[in-house]
Amino acid sequence: AIENRFGLKYWSGAAEDHICKPFVGIEGYKEKGTAVTFSKYDLKKLFADEGFEYQRLYYVLPDYKFPVVIYTDKYVPNASTLSKLAFSYIDNSILLWNEAKLYKDIINNNVQDFFANSFLIEVSRVKLENNQPVYITAKAEARKPYRVTTLIYDDRHIEKIPVHEAAIAHI
């Protein structure tokens, strides 16, 4: 898992997670010797150049440290789902707008992969297994009876997993 250098949170003014300054990633990391993050294109190329021909990319929101929605190009969440996410930012952030309010236009323009805040990526030199989850939601912050993780698979079957014993009744 890694942050997306072009994640919407960074365009919104969030400080870069490793350097604690806003805009440094989208400006190309001008300071030498600092931690860096990568775009989708950069990650895919980096792994392909190392012989990892098979790749599966997941997009994570709000980010990989606090995942609530994990999705793929095969199953994009609707804007309503994303507009309800709680986003948090580290100190030194200079927020220019409400990130959640932009997702409708981002999804309607099919650029959600470019602006995803984080990535999970599976890479392999051999073909990856088929029928993996294409969409996952986790409600760890909900009240105990509603803490359910939902997985939607490539073949569109749905699996619900209770995260708390009290949530079993809601499956």
Question: Which sequence ranges carry the predicted segments?
Answer:
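Conserved class I S-adenosyl-L-methionine
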Residues: 1-23
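Conserved catalytic loop of SAM-dependent methyltransferase domains
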Residues: 55-92
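ATP-binding glycine-rich loop module of kinase domains
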Residues: 135-171
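Short alpha-helix
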Residues: 32-59
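Core SAM-dependent methyltransferase catalytic element
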Residues: 73-77, 110-132
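C-terminal alpha-helical "lid/dimerization" subdomain adjacent to the S-adenosyl-L-methionine
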Residues: 15-38
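Short catalytic/ligand-binding loop motif for oxyanion handling, primarily in non-cytosolic enzymes
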Residues: 6-11, 63-69, 129-132
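Conserved Class I S-adenosyl-L-methionine
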Residues: 88-120
